[in-house]
């Protein structure tokens, strides 16, 4: 089956860079070595305030211990001078993946990613009016989502094995379609719905073996669900340094799809007899009928 790649994944960093990189270094010493760290959700401070904690790393005075790849959510990512809007390195071992797409990391993992947040007022507008210049818009467009879908299916390898990891800031609408009492909906009583129909599209269309998302400050692993090639495991991750001590990190060991034949890639379903249908396309479970008195 090939060698597994050990990675760390964190939820929203929210500008808590010192805590993030200290945690990564500590975990790498205790349980590593890890070959990558992936960050989903809001990476920079939510209100666009100072990101001074990042400066020592950008200036080379402090080092990022593990190659770190991040996306952004709906925060203002522009306070950091020189943020490459289409992705690139901020400093050694710290890489912004970009707005939307699919790429292979040096460790062999194939990741699909979508930065930004869903805004129904902007979603169907043309990129002509929102792209260009040096500023990064905090929302994504329908064509960005389609770009991720297309990139995840381009090439013989992707057609056979899909991608290893889907990274989004948000959770998708209908993620809870098939949940029951054994896995309660952690967002059921939230006063504001922050779920994204665009992420629903990605969850249903991208054959990823893992889907990582932040934003909700919830740590949860949902039962694996069937995609068109194998099975997807969804992880919601808490924010780094959150006051309620929600777990913000998960460690994974992943065999890159490049090392898997089609039959091995499909073993994801065979190895998980409890894999559910895709929640994004499935019909809701019927509600229990109360017993008559």
Residue spans for each PLM region:
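Extended recognition/assembly regions associated with phosphoester-bond processing machinery
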Residues: 1-293
